[in-house]
Regions:
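A conserved mid-protein helix/loop that constitutes part of the nucleotide-sugar donor-binding site
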Residues: 17-25
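A short beta-strand/loop micro-motif in the catalytic core of glycosyltransferases
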Residues: 107, 153-162
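Proline-aspartate-enriched helix->loop->beta-strand connector
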Residues: 103-105
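Short His-centered aromatic/hydrophobic patch
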Residues: 87-91, 109-115, 133
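Nucleotide-sugar donor-binding and catalytic loop/hinge architecture
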Residues: 1-2, 192-202
Length: 202
């Protein structure tokens, strides 16, 4: 069985979180035990899900003992920047140890991806790295430099829409890496439930 790890240290409940859950659940339901989805709990952000919503018993591994993201909202320009810096500082060494110890077959990066991109480029792990883009990223100077030197060392970049795909495909070093992969937000059971709902005419 191949291992698929998800990296998604979120600072507030955004659509990406639901996309990670549905992606992991889909793998567990439909891969016929070919893949094992595992979510990395970077700093307590997945504690609430693990305790209350993990109906399929997805495997969740703690990367650190920190609970700084557990039930807390770190939105806002300065707060988010400070927490990103803090996360990078406390997870740099644990992430290296984790990748050396567990040797994931696949590592899917969703949020705060700069650290795993950098670590992978420095140590050239054999893990297949997939960068998941949630929306069109803002290309500040730091991201431009980082991506230019790290994207070449990963296997795939996925975009959730054709629009984002077409925009990113214009960047030379992304052309051979970028693919479209729509978010698995709605599950088959939810579709069946919606089909039974009555539509009120107005």
């Amino acid at each position: 069985m191949k291992s698929v790890y998800y990296w998604c240290p979120y600072i507030s409940k955004v659509a990406t979180v639901r996309a990670v859950i549905k992606s992991a659940e889909s793998l567990k339901r439909y891969s016929k035990d070919s893949y094992e989805p595992i979510i990395l709990n970077v700093a307590g952000e997945w504690n609430d899900f693990k305790d209350k919503e993990n109906t399929l018993a997805l495997k969740i591994i703690n990367l650190t003992n920190s609970k700084i993201l557990d039930g807390k909202n770190w939105t806002g320009f300065w707060k988010s920047r400070l927490i990103y810096i803090y996360l990078i500082l406390i997870t740099f060494i644990p992430l290296i140890i984790f990748l050396k110890k567990y040797k994931p077959d696949f590592f899917i990066l969703h949020l705060v991806s700069s650290l795993p991109l950098l670590v992978n480029s420095l140590f050239k792990f054999k893990t297949k790295i997939i960068l998941r883009i949630s929306g069109m990223p803002k290309f500040n100077l730091f991201r431009k430099i980082l991506w230019k030197h790290t994207i070449i060392n990963i296997d795939l970049v996925t975009a959730p829409t054709l629009g984002t795909y077409n925009d990113l495909k214009k960047i030379d070093y992304l052309k051979s890496k970028i693919r479209v992969l729509f978010d698995p937000i709605i599950s088959p059971s939810e579709i069946q439930k919606k089909k039974k709902e009555k539509i009120n005419d107005s």
